[in-house]
């Protein structure tokens, strides 16, 4: 149990740090802040698909705890995505909210599928 908690914790710190850095990197480049979160979530979807695919050929629970649960769990953020959607809706930016929701869902599905393909599961 302690080993699992330690692995998740060791992965979570760099995942959260990288998310912070990437979102702040995208912010000056793209006027709408929600696209930084989008980029992080799509890349996390790809990486999770890749890990799941690779884990099928070379199973490793400690690696999944460190990278999937710890790193990617703190790197991507569904709750921020939902808040950003609600902010757009409250601003009456319904088209932008719909575009973000569809792009996130479709992009996430394709990213996971691509990760699974590269990881050898698909």
Which residues fall in each region the model found?
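Membrane-interface helix-loop junctions in multi-pass transporters/channels
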Residues: 1-122
